[in-house]
């Protein structure tokens, strides 16, 4: 892609997200979402082939449908309340339709079907943007709407997302699809805690983005996209294999790594609000995710194929210009748990 065109696209993507996050008026927020959607399409089609074209088409049709639903909800709310303010979504029908539209944009269940297909059809870098940056704008709107949303609908979507995110990833061999189902599962945790403590939703989002960025950068640097290619990682890049192993354990929420922090705080918040069954169900369903993370670790770190000494030395001569951010990301991905008391004090 032309560097000038790419810089313009990325600037527009950043601006669209920023407009939505800073908006208190529904019309400007909707405009930011549309900028975000339209600039994401050429990013998905960075390499022109039938699979990326199909993925971009699916993304466009799903997001356009969600945008129409959102505009319909805004119109209904305007008719009944005369308000364009995001925090004044008082009409229950408009609130429910807007909630479903934003859930579709986020890719949470039962509106999740486009996420694995689109992620699998594109390269690792567009997939990384899709599963990280594209969550910011819709979730910022849900954060502002938290007071007026239908909590039962949020709980249902959250529990379904955790279940489907774990269940769907069990039988996958493609890493992009596994990370897509992981994204759906994490989105379920964020949605469930939203009515109780929106700040914890933002904390979970920040740590999820940090972990997902780390994994995608490791996979991009080792040119790994499937489980079969994971088995060669230890022979080629042992250092990155160890990084991948610890980051996957952190993504699964295993103590004492960073990914345990939001799960610990969210379960504590739910039990503090006399909700016992829900956090127990969430923790049990998350074991499905832990299973396929462990399977990835087994293939990458615990299975070593026969190799020659020449093959073992290749990791010393690989191009390292794209790995400058990795040490910082990996450190943050694995060592934030000691800061948990400070985070609790800030709530």
Swiss-Prot record:
Disulfide bonds: none annotated. The chain crosses the membrane at residues 3-23, 59-79, 93-115, 150-170, 178-198, 200-220, 240-260, 274-294, 326-346. GO terms for molecular function: NADH dehydrogenase (ubiquinone) activity. Keywords: Electron transport, Membrane, Mitochondrion, Mitochondrion inner membrane, NAD, Respiratory chain, Translocase, Transmembrane, Transmembrane helix, Transport, Ubiquinone. GO terms for biological process: mitochondrial electron transport, NADH to ubiquinone; mitochondrial respiratory chain complex I assembly. Belongs to the complex I subunit 2 family. Core subunit of respiratory chain NADH dehydrogenase (Complex I) which is composed of 45 different subunits. Interacts with TMEM242. This is NADH-ubiquinone oxidoreductase chain 2. It comes from Elephas maximus. The gene is MT-ND2.
């Amino acid at each position: 892609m032309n560097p000038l065109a790419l810089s313009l696209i990325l600037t527009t993507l950043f601006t669209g997200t920023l407009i939505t996050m800073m908006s208190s008026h529904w019309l400007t927020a909707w405009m930011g979402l549309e900028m975000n959607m339209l600039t994401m399409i050429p990013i998905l089609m960075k390499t022109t082939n039938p699979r990326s074209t199909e993925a971009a088409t699916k993304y466009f049709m799903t997001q356009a449908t969600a945008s129409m639903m959102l505009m319909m909800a805004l119109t209904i709310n305007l008719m009944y309340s005369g308000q364009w303010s995001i925090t004044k979504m008082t009409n229950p029908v408009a609130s429910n339709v807007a909630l479903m539209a934003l859930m579709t944009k986020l890719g949470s269940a039962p509106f999740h079907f486009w996420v694995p297909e689109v992620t699998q059809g594109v390269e690792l870098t567009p997939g990384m943007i899709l599963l990280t940056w594209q969550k910011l704008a819709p979730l910022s709107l849900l954060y502002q709407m938290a007071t007026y949303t239908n909590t039962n609908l949020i709980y249902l979507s959250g529990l379904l997302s955790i279940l489907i995110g774990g269940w769907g990833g069990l039988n996958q061999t493609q890493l992009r699809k596994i990370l897509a189902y992981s994204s759906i599962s994490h989105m379920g945790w964020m949605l469930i805690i939203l009515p109780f403590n929106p700040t914890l939703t933002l904390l979970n989002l920040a740590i999820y983005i940090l972990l997902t960025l780390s994994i995608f950068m490791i996979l991009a640097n080792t040119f790994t996209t499937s489980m079969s290619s994971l088995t060669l990682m230890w022979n080629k890049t042992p250092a990155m294999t160890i990084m991948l192993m610890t980051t996957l354990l952190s993504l699964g929420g295993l103590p004492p790594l960073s990914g345990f922090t939001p799960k610990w705080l969210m379960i504590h918040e739910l039990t503090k609000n006399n909700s016992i069954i829900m956090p127990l169900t969430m923790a049990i369903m998350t074991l499905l995710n832990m299973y396929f993370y462990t399977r990835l670790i087994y293939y990458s770190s615990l299975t070593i194929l026969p190799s020659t000494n020449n093959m073992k030395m290749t990791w010393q001569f690989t191009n390292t210009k794209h790995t400058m951010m990795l040490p910082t990301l990996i450190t943050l991905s694995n060592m934030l748990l000691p800061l948990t008391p400070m985070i609790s004090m800030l709530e």
